[in-house]
């Protein structure tokens, strides 16, 4: 009897815990915060399924989704705004059906429901192939439970919808079920750090009675259909995650999309009865061949581009160096063209239109750059990549949606120079830090794999401050900093936006001591291939208290807070580059003062020399010398390394907060 009871309980435990419309007063007691103490909503259930069914002429895919959400406070009111994107192409489309949405509130111990009016569903056209259905659930309050259910019938049956088991709110039950006929073989691509509560599959058989065209008339229009009965084997896959904590953004991350628990599908092979298996998933060479022929990508790189000849000849007139030719063309495009979209896989306008309008998306501008380089007789190709904010590319699978960015590359004397003419402050042969996101591909018949890893970016910053007394009892100083290359890029953006004067006003404000700044200048501000150098003089009025002067020797260069806030982390630390931050202070003591206290020297190594923090202090006569160096050897660290990295930075923060104390001589 006990065994039977245990079996029943175990079976119930594996069933979905919610059904549409079955909301009781007991459900309103659900206020679990152990998964996230700051939660504003709880996803009580998120259940989806995809299955093949009978359509007008062939299979359709039926996607169903049901969600039950508890609204804890007003910060989650946006959960009541629902958007469903649908695709259409030619005569085929995805149709939204059976929309049900209800808000439940507990009033005087009774469950009161408010249903969505069918007239409250609106349609928004995004482009020629996409529309968005939108609606907002009514009467949502703090404490409400909302339910949403809908079906999407798709005439694109082979594109299975992906599923995210994790998001920005805690999820008590997330389930996805897929039924696949034996004719279609898919690759399952999953990611994340949570274990499945249930992961199983079972086989069965199902009969589909389809009507298919038996002959075609003039122009290919169907004039007759016949009935076909198919009984393929069916494999049902089911994945469930339970009690999933939200994944929240922290410092040093590319995008949460790389790390949430998620599954997607790619059709690999079609195998119909009595037919040879047909591979569907492309290979990298085939994928690149398609792009090279695609008129919306590289198909026009070497066609009908005679209009470029005159400009290219003018730019390269009298130049014999291939590198200088490439530089002149690159600078011309960078300085004269405006990017309208920094996330675009395909070109929406021709190279000629881009050339004439002097604007375009990232693909359009950099494809035009490639065409101009080729017109100059240079060996140039596009490179396809994904930016850090877009997500990772799967090296094994050529999936177009994983890419969102095109840059150019030119080969000169066996050396490759990557270029991106959409960013106004990049030097020749440089890419923006957002492009360093791992796997990339050369768009050429060879489809060569390239890698732009953050670990390959070694960025050094060197700062020096000289401080000494002036004739008015104040401290005067000189500040000089050679910024990292990518901080230089940000600096140039700020100066363009605000002007040098306002830039230095912000510097003065951020110095963390009462200073007056003067003689500010920035060297290499317009020399984009070099790091910027910031120089200024300042006067500091030291605060004296009971004959003591307290100074923070790191001033504005201190690491003031630990960038790693959480006690633990379930995804990697992904810095944009490998830092080497150097700071020196030369301090001449003001007359009549001695050093009462100063930081002690320390050297801390991280992980057997993979990082080092040096804080060295010395005094010789009335001169104090201080040096700080924070250097790492990698940009990326695993979750297992997080605690030690966090502790390492905690040492840096505490040391940088220490003060020099000067005492007035009696």
Protein language model regions, located:
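Bacterial Sec-dependent N-terminal signal peptides
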Residues: 1-16, 666
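Beta-strand-rich, non-transmembrane domain signature
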Residues: 12-282, 290-291, 351, 364-370, ...
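Alpha-helix initiation and N-capping motif
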Residues: 64, 173, 281-285, 294, ...
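Sec-exported extracytoplasmic/periplasmic mature domains
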Residues: 72, 151, 313-317, 334-338, ...
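Secondary-structure boundary elements
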Residues: 284-357
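Extended, non-catalytic structural segments that build the interaction scaffolds
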Residues: 313-318, 463-464, 570-575, 595
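A carboxyl-terminal module marker
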Residues: 504-666
């Amino acid at each position: 009897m006990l065994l039977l009871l245990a079996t029943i309980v175990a079976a119930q435990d594996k069933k979905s815990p919610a059904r549409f419309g079955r909301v009781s007063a007991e459900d309103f007691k659900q206020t679990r915060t152990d998964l996230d103490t700051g939660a504003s909503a709880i996803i009580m259930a998120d259940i989806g399924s995809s299955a093949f069914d009978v359509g007008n002429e062939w299979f359709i895919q039926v996607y169903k989704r049901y969600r039950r959400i508890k609204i804890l406070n007003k910060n989650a009111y946006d959960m009541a705004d629902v958007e469903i994107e649908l695709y259409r192409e030619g005569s085929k489309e995805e149709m939204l059906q059976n929309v049900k949405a209800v808000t439940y509130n507990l009033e005087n111990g009774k469950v009161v429901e408010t249903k969505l009016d069918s007239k409250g569903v609106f349609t928004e056209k995004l482009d020629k192939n996409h529309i968005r259905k939108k609606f907002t659930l009514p009467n949502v309050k703090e404490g409400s439970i909302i339910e949403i259910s809908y079906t999407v019938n798709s005439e694109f049956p082979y594109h299975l919808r992906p599923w995210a088991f994790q998001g920005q709110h805690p999820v008590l039950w997330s389930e996805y079920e897929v039924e696949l006929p034996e004719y279609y073989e898919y690759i399952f691509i999953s990611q994340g750090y949570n274990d499945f509560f249930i992961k199983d599959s079972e086989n069965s058989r199902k009969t589909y009675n389809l009507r298919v065209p038996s002959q075609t008339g003039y122009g290919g229009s169907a004039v007759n259909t016949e009935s076909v009965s198919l009984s393929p084997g069916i494999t049902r896959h089911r994945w469930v995650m339970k009690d999933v904590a939200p994944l929240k953004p922290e410092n040093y991350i590319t995008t949460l999309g790389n790390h949430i628990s998620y599954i997607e599908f790619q059709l690999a092979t079609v195998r119909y009865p009595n037919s040879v298996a047909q591979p569907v998933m492309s290979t990298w060479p085939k994928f690149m061949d398609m792009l090279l022929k695609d008129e919306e990508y590289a198909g026009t790189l070497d066609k009908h581009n005679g209009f470029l000849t005159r400009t290219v000849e003018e730019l390269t007139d009298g130049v014999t160096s291939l590198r200088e030719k490439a530089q002149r063309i690159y600078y011309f495009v960078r300085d004269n063209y405006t990017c309208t979209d920094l996330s675009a896989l395909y070109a929406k306008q021709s190279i000629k239109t881009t050339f004439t309008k002097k604007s375009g998306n990232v693909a359009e501008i950099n494809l035009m750059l490639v065409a101009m380089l080729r017109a100059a007789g240079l060996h140039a190709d596009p490179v396809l990549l994904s930016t850090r904010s877009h997500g990772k590319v799967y090296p094994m699978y050529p999936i177009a949606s994983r890419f969102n960015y095109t840059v150019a590359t030119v080969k000169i004397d066996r050396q490759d120079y990557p270029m991106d003419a959409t960013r106004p402050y990049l030097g020749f042969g440089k890419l923006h830090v957002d492009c360093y996101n791992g796997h990339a591909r050369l768009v050429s018949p060879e489809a060569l794999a390239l890698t732009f890893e953050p670990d390959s970016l070694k960025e050094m910053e060197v700062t020096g401050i000289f401080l000494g007394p002036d004739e008015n009892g104040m401290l005067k100083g000189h500040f000089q900093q050679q910024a990292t290359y990518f901080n230089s890029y940000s600096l140039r953006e700020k100066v363009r936006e605000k002007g040098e004067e306002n830039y230095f006003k912000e510097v003065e404000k951020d110095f963390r001591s009462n200073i007056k700044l003067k003689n500010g200048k920035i060297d290499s501000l317009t020399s984009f291939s070099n790091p910027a150098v910031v120089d200024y003089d300042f006067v500091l009025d030291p605060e004296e208290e009971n004959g003591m002067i307290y100074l923070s020797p790191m001033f504005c260069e201190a690491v003031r807070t630990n960038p790693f806030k959480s006690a633990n982390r379930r995804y990697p630390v992904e810095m944009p580059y490998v830092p080497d931050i150097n700071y020196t202070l030369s301090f001449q003591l003001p007359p009549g003062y001695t050093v009462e206290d100063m930081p002690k020297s320390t050297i801390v190594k991280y992980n057997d020399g993979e990082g080092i923090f040096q804080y060295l202090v010395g005094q010789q006569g009335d001169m104090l010398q201080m040096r700080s160096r924070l250097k790492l050897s990698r940009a990326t660290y695993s979750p297992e390394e997080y605690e030690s990295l966090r502790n390492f930075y905690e040492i840096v923060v505490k040391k940088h907060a220490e003060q020099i104390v000067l005492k007035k001589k009696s």
